[in-house]
Design a protein with these regions (language model features):
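Bacterial N-terminal signal peptides that target proteins for export
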Residues: 1-9
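Bacterial N-terminal signal peptides
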Residues: 9-17
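Boundary at the C-terminal end of the N-terminal hydrophobic targeting segment
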Residues: 18-23, 27
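An edge-strand/N-cap motif at the start of beta-rich repeat modules
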Residues: 30-40
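Conserved anchor residues at repeat-unit boundaries in beta-strand-based tandem repeats, strongest
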Residues: 38-49, 61-72, 84-95, 107-118, ...
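Extracellular beta-strand solenoid repeats
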Residues: 53, 76, 99, 122, ...
Length: 368
């Protein structure tokens, strides 16, 4: 965020006087000059010296100390635009400590060098913005803190009015970034904590987290891997707060492509994902040792697949929303085999049940 600087440059107050002869007196005198200016004050050797006031037809006025015809020491300068400077002068220019108040309500208090803001100081803007820190040639420079009235603040390094180096931003929405800056943007190593508690750590470029990084969720989930536009993109690993681990591909922040999920309870899946859900082909191993291999949709067996139960029984055939549904073959522990239709997990419709060579039934079934 760039802040428009106050118009800090001042008119140099060195006065070029005209005329041939000047009084040698140290007493107070009044002089008028060819440029229309008036000086009322003390002189020495024909030059303004001591204390006096110099004014111009355009409304400019300086009152303060003089040495050999120049404003040197403490004084007050009033400008035609309504701005007022009060402080130290050297050779007719603000030098040292001084403060200026602008007609629009803006203020600066601090160090000056040759009529420019330079060194440590405080700038206050009409809109409530406040900067405290270093300046060089009227620009923020060095260490400084900028605070806006909407809650935004930056504390850190500045180079010629631009955030450059190490710093911390507190955003108006509650987010916070700590890290490196280049050309007013997050650039380099840094950490961003969003308003909802998500933490993004890694290398930034032009304000965006790119390449490999870390994303920490408020619930304790931690992602390490490739990132694009602040989201998981590419290959990475998530360690979930419950102990589960996912290793694989991501797209736009979702598990997508091929990946492996290792559950803390012994569950295991390896296969395809889409928008964060198990979808496509894969193999699922359950904590009890059962294994399903086949097609999935929205985290459930859907399409063609085979399950081998922990006790050795099997089913090969169609599935719908995680349930045996359609044509398939079940092999039971007692040696029986059924081939035919299923509905909602039960034998339903036409099918054939056999038990070795001793039993065979071929016909219709209803609800198992």
């Amino acid at each position: 965020m760039r802040i428009k600087m106050l118009p800090f440059a001042l008119v140099v107050i060195t006065i070029a006087f005209c005329g041939a002869a000047y009084s040698q007196s140290l007493g107070e005198q009044t002089k008028q000059y060819e440029n229309g200016g008036f000086y009322k004050g003390t002189f020495k050797n024909g030059r303004q010296h001591g204390y006096g006031t110099y004014s111009l037809p355009n409304g400019y006025e300086y009152s303060g100390e003089w040495v050999n015809g120049q404003a040197v020491g403490e004084g007050i300068a009033k400008f035609s635009n309504g701005s007022i400077y009060e402080g130290a002068f050297i050779n007719g220019k603000p030098n040292g400590f001084g403060k200026i108040k602008y007609a629009d309500g803006g203020k600066y208090t601090g160090s000056w060098v040759d009529a420019q803001i330079d060194g440590q100081g405080v700038a206050e803007y009409p809109n409530g913005t406040r900067y405290t820190g270093g300046f060089s040639a009227n620009k923020y420079h060095g260490k400084g803190t900028l605070v806006l009235n909407n809650g935004y603040s930056y504390e850190g390094d500045w180079v010629n009015g631009i955030k450059e180096g190490q710093g911390t931003i507190n955003y108006a929405d509650g987010a916070m970034y700590t890290g490196q800056f280049v050309a007013d943007s997050r650039n380099g190593d840094g950490s961003l904590t969003t308003a909802d508690g998500i933490v993004l750590i890694g290398v930034w470029k032009k304000g965006e987290l790119i390449g490999k990084g870390t994303v920490k969720q408020p619930n304790g989930d931690i992602y390490n891997g490739e990132i694009k536009n602040g989201r998981q993109e590419g290959t990475g690993e998530v360690v979930y707060s419950n102990g589960d681990v996912y290793i694989g591909q991501f797209s736009n922040g979702f598990r997508q492509g091929s990946g492996e999920l290792i559950g803390a309870d012994g569950y295991h899946y390896i296969g395809n994902w889409f928008e964060g859900q198990i979808s496509g082909s894969g193999t699922e191993t359950y904590p009890d040792g059962s294994v399903y291999q086949g097609e999935f949709l929205a985290n459930l067996a859907d399409g063609k697949g085979k399950i081998t139960y922990a006790n050795g029984a099997t089913y090969v055939g169609n599935w719908k929303a995680g349930t045996v549904d359609g044509k398939g073959t079940s092999t039971y522990l007692n040696g029986m085999t059924y081939t035919g239709n299923f509905e909602n997990g039960k034998i339903h419709g036409f099918g054939v049940m056999t038990f070795g060579n001793s039993y065979r039934y071929e016909g219709n079934w209803k609800d198992g």
